């Protein structure tokens, strides 16, 4: 007679491999499929509500859902709403409106001037150099 019981975790069973494969899928592709399902569900709910309210352009509601549910917009809006003066070296109003954390210098928000990083402060004008914008090429004085 076997020393292990049929209910022991070492026995595995027919569903152990399926459970492990599902867990692996859920960590990789499952998040994307879940996001797609939520976006489509929200779009169809918005379409149904707009048709029920007899709005003139129901497609506008669906378009709005897809614009609002962009994945990259969420971290920027969260970062912009939680800016605190203690963390940033600039004023709290500027850090909240720009969505950038001045201390970390990382911002992938559409609000940042260069797109991928927060713009560094403009250099001070000296006799040998002109003040340049952070994303434009240097302007040489004549």
Curated annotation (Swiss-Prot):
Q: Which GO terms describe its cellular component?
A: plasma membrane
Extract the ranges annotated as region (Disordered). Answer: 73-142
Q: Give GO MF terms, alphabetically.
A: transmembrane transporter activity
UniProt biased composition (Low complexity): 81-142
The protein's job, in short, is:
Involved in the resistance (detoxification) of the fungal toxin fusaric acid.
Instruction: State what protein this is by name.
Output: Fusaric acid resistance protein FusB
The organism of origin for this protein: Burkholderia cepacia (Pseudomonas cepacia)
């Amino acid at each position: 007679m076997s020393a292990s019981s049929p209910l022991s975790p070492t026995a595995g069973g027919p569903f152990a491999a399926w459970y492990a494969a599902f867990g692996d899928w859920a960590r990789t592709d499952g998040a994307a499929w879940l996001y797609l399902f939520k976006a489509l569900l929200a779009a169809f709910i918005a379409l149904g509500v707009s048709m029920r309210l007899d709005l003139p352009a129901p497609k506008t509601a669906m378009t709005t859902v897809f614009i609002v549910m962009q994945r990259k917009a969420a971290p920027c809006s969260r970062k912009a709403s939680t800016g605190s003066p203690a963390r940033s070296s600039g004023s709290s109003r500027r850090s909240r409106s720009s969505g950038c954390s001045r201390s970390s210098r990382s911002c992938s928000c559409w609000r940042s001037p260069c797109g991928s990083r927060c713009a560094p402060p403009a250099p001070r004008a000296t006799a040998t150099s002109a003040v340049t914008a952070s994303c434009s090429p240097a302007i040489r004085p004549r």
